[in-house]
Amino acid sequence: MEPKYQRILIKLSGEALAGDKGVGIDIPTVQSIAKEIAEVHNSGVQIALVIGGGNLWRGEPAAEAGMDRVQADYTGMLGTVMNALVMADSLQQYGVDTRVQTAIPMQTVAEPYVRGRALRHLEKDRIVVFGAGIGSPYFSTDTTAALRAAEIEAEAILMAKNGVDGVYNADPKKDANAVKFDELTHVEVIKRGLKIMDATASTISMDNDIDLVVFNMNETGNIKRVVLGEQIGTTVSNKASE
């Protein structure tokens, strides 16, 4: 079966790397995720990654506790680089040539983010892991994912969620009558105020015609199923469902 998408960006939360611990980095968990990503990559799909840093640091609570917000956000960016390096190492162990590019230069451990270089890596079948957000405070890793996806001309952003199998009209953990959407448009997401991504990220995705697929990453094989076009999770696009 031919993949639905040829070039994707996978957005992982930092907590996804923590496993059952909830904080820190659990290497077996990272290896499990890397194995699945490597299998999809080996099917011929070009892949980039953005990983959050919430397993190591959260800037907003630190700022609320009195820390300077800019410094708190920069600290969080460094956390995303740690996650990127660990994931890149695991991907390399599965035989996938991988590069880490950071928005804040730190050439001893990673390449600086250069769009043209990132595109060349993808064209040469390397996975690129983007770290340090966009290099500026006040911007989330969701916005980073949308911006980088637009820059590398990705067809879709795969929002891999922990235990969440899509987008609902209410919190399914609190409302037994919550209804899951199979398809939505970017406009509907913004109008309904659905908190899939922040508003900036949603707008970038809409303006650049990038599909957004929200799915449960805890089920093995789901990344491959999304890439092959199976109906799992929720797909957000500019096309209204028929």
Curated annotation (Swiss-Prot):
Name a Pfam family for this protein: AA_kinase
Q: Does the keyword Lyase apply?
A: no
Gene Ontology molecular function: ATP binding; UMP kinase activity
Keywords from the UniProt entry? Allosteric enzyme, ATP-binding, Cytoplasm, Kinase, Nucleotide-binding, Pyrimidine biosynthesis, Transferase
Which organism is this protein's natural source?
Streptococcus agalactiae serotype III (strain NEM316)
Q: What InterPro entries does this protein's entry cite?
A: AceGlu_kinase-like_sf (IPR036393), Asp/Glu/Uridylate_kinase (IPR001048), Uridylate_kinase (IPR011817), Uridylate_kinase_bac (IPR015963)
The protein's predominant localisation is: cytoplasm
**The name this protein goes by in its record:** Uridylate kinase
The organism's lineage is:
Bacteria, Bacillati, Bacillota, Bacilli, Lactobacillales
| EC top class, as a word | transferase
